[in-house]
Amino acid sequence: MINIYTDGASSGNPGPGGFGVILHSGKHYKEISEGYRKTTNNRMELMAVITGLESIKNPGQVIMIYSDSKYIIDAVEKKWVFNWVRTNFKDKKNKDLWLRFLEVYKKHQIQFTWVKGHNGHPENERCDELAVQASKQMNLLIDIYFEKEELKLNL
């Protein structure tokens, strides 16, 4: 089994943000993080999960994802995201990331475990640390889809 621990953070919503991921299986351990200049907490939570899953090269893996994001866990476990696909994400945010998530989701056997954030869970705390550090980097990435959508709303 592969364990993926994730967290996302943003300073302001929207604002600078980042995500942190830990992949752990047996002796293998990897940390990943990235920061964006303008994004939202939910986008960073979702990017953490996507990045973790996209890091797994062999399909058909049994994966446990640990997240403190009810947004993601409820969307998948309560099947909301599959209904959003049927309605072409009408009035829903983060379509680009949900479609990207679904591409990797179908390649594996995935389960989610909710962990309470900022409650002493070592891997969640480390992912939070990675996410916050990433959001404070000098050369932040551009969340192109988000910034383009936000620009449309403000025109």
Identify the meaning behind each predicted range:
Residues 1-47, 53-61, 129, 137-146, ...:
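RNase H-like nuclease fold core
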Residues 73-74, 151-155:
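Short, mixed-charge aromatic SLiMs
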Residues 6-13, 50-126, 130, 135, ...:
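RNase H catalytic domain
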